[in-house]
């Protein structure tokens, strides 16, 4: 798999790249590195999404953790941000989530959180990875009464939902909301959350069967939700991904409201209420240029990081900001959470609409979005490596940047979670960015597809 840890934990095709043997080793190494041998029975909370392979990997992780004396608290099917929250709630040393987020069901992944609920920094991931690859953990295997045990957390869903409810001061009674659970982790919590907050819920795609997670539904396939909201005359629609750390929305007219729009709406509201720390918002290099102009117009500072909510969070912690996110819907309300949380984002947005007595369609006009295209080019692991040294590709990218000038931009990057080269072109002239982006994609295919 190359380097084990990408931008969002370990990820790969289950039982091919991400095997039970590897998962067991990761469990052992995580327990040893994160507790540094200071506790006889360190406690780990362990959650999973709805993929067919999640049960298998759960068993392997449990075996690895218990074999070095860790106590494992099983949370069952639950969201990634729930794991991050419950680490602290249950006074655990660390948390682990089994999920491949927005990827198809055949993929799976392992995300690790420290005791304070934050994703691990690169340095700790490197330590775990080194231990896994060198296999040095076997001499420290526990025996006798030192072997770890497993506990089931029967109230995990309730505890997490109560936490989310505590973040909103208003009832959502009377609001008509469609909720697309993506046949993923939100299937375990969304209906309970929105119903208890008083909303009239239309719960969609909440029947996971192990293989239908993210399948033509959720935040990566918004078309059916857009149609549903418009057809049924609802106030808003919200959609999550497989592990519910993302949220995208649909307004009352059936139009898509992506992460940049959600951030613009929420950031301005927070600023006007004196709740936006240092009047600043953190985004990424992929954040739409229209959002950056929006921040300038409203005297808000904008900070851009590398792609990945972990990097957004790092900047927030470094500069003591409390709000940031990504166009993809990873949005971090740091006053309430340590990571992106789709369901938290949804109820914060709905609460804002209730407080302002506004329709989402009217608030979406606050920001003018620049035309933007995204092209994904599938490549092998070797192709991803070759991308960095291919001078022909680099020359074509530089040519594209020159053509777009100051009125647009192009970003070409290797995906940290999938076997893809991602191309984003943006500017005022849609025809131009389509032409420029397509040319770069064609060159990448020509140069890397055979690698």
Question: Which residues are covered by each model-predicted region?
Answer:
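Short glycine-rich phosphate-binding loop at a beta-alpha junction
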Residues: 39-49, 73, 176-179, 279-285, ...
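An N-terminal, well-structured beta->alpha segment
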Residues: 1-63, 67-68, 146, 150-177, ...
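Phosphate-binding and adjacent anionic-ligand microenvironments
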Residues: 236, 273-451
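Gly/Ser/Thr-enriched, mixed-charge loops and adjacent short helices
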Residues: 13, 108-230
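Gly/Ser/Thr-rich active-site loops/lids in small-molecule metabolic enzymes
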Residues: 121, 203-204, 255-274, 342-351, ...
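N-terminal small/polar loop signature for handling phosphorylated ligands or for N-terminal nucleophile
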Residues: 32, 40-108, 192-250
